[in-house]
UniProtKB/Swiss-Prot annotation:
GO CC term (a single one): ribonucleoprotein complex
EC class (word): transferase
Region span, Disordered: 1-56
Molecular-function GO term, any one: methyltransferase activity
The protein's name in its UniProt record: rRNA 2'-O-methyltransferase fibrillarin
Length: 297
């Protein structure tokens, strides 16, 4: 469930987490969505795989009440999905739902199911985070792009008017991002996120930074990139894996320490959610960089 920033900094998002729903934006559930998958990445490519759903059963797709660009597929179980920018093509073997004019549209639309066991951003939405700050037209710097599972969904969110700048250290994995960028608004950057000046000519000022880099110094990496690319009042979303930072301490203690580091670098935390049951000892923190003070009228 949504955690706060009460005593101890770790908030209530700690170990309980609950099964999560869709926050205030829809029904329960979502099920397991096809197994645990593989952390950030998932398998390569996917090509035209994945298959289409909704052929026999009645499926209704509704916009999420809290997150622009995110939809809820209502069938036997409710699932998150995004509007596929490239209809007919699956990125990582995900299921697709094709709907026609029966829901009031003139053209057919295709939605891609968003599996919370393969995307920490999706699991944060299931857990009830109130905003991810990646709506249509947004410019997003994505640190830790991996094979592009979540990157592809973020590109659906920002749409053709937005852009995703995806940084990934691995050259082998980066090839998948390069291939994906041929069809989606993605700028693939194969570099080390610790050195943002190496890609300063490729990234403009952005509206939001999403970070999924499991490193002990991830708070410092986020701060360096925020100083280089995040506009004042811009937002960040960071996935914190406690065991990767300090496996000798309890997860809430580690997360509280990371929050303090963020605050020192003017990265003010706004909310925190636990990713249970999708990920153990993980939390997602949403915050704002150098918040702009509202002028008094």
């Amino acid at each position: 469930m949504r955690g706060g920033f009460g005593r101890g900094g770790g908030g209530r998002g700690g170990s309980r987490g609950g099964r999560g729903g869709f926050g205030r934006g829809g029904g329960r559930g979502g099920g397991r969505g096809g197994g645990r998958g593989g952390g950030r990445g998932g398998g390569r490519g996917g090509g035209r795989g994945g298959g289409r759903g909704g052929a026999g059963a009645k499926v209704i797709v509704e916009p999420h009440m809290l997150h622009p660009g995110v939809f809820i597929s209502k069938a036997k179980t409710d699932s998150l999905c995004t509007l596929n920018m490239v209809p007919g093509i699956s990125v990582y073997g995900e299921k697709r739902i094709e709907l026609g004019a029966t829901q009031g549209g003139d053209d057919k639309k295709e939605y891609r199911l968003w599996n919370p066991y393969r995307s920490k951003l999706a699991s944060a939405i299931y857990a009830g985070v109130s905003s991810i700050h990646m709506g249509p037209g947004s410019k997003v710097l994505y640190l830790g792009g991996a094979t592009g599972t979540t990157v592809s969904h973020v590109s659906d969110l920002v749409g053709p008017e937005g852009m995703v700048y995806a940084v990934e250290f691995s050259h082998r994995v980066g090839r998948d991002l390069v291939e994906m960028s041929k069809r989606r608004p993605i700028v693939p950057i194969v570099e080390d996120a610790r050195y943002p000046m190496k890609y300063r000519m490729l990234v403009p000022m952005v509206d939001c930074i999403f970070m999924d880099v499991a490193q002990p110094d991830q708070a410092r990496i986020l701060a360096l990139n925020a100083q280089a690319f995040l506009q004042n009042g811009g937002h960040y979303v960071i996935s914190i894996k406690a065991n990767c930072i300090d496996s000798t301490l309890e997860a809430p203690v580690v997360i509280a320490s990371e929050l303090n580091k963020l605050k020192k670098d003017k990265l003010k935390p706004l909310e925190q959610v636990s990713l249970e049951p999708f990920e153990r000892d993980h939390a997602v923190v949403v915050g704002v960089y150098r918040p702009v003070k509202k002028s008094k009228q």
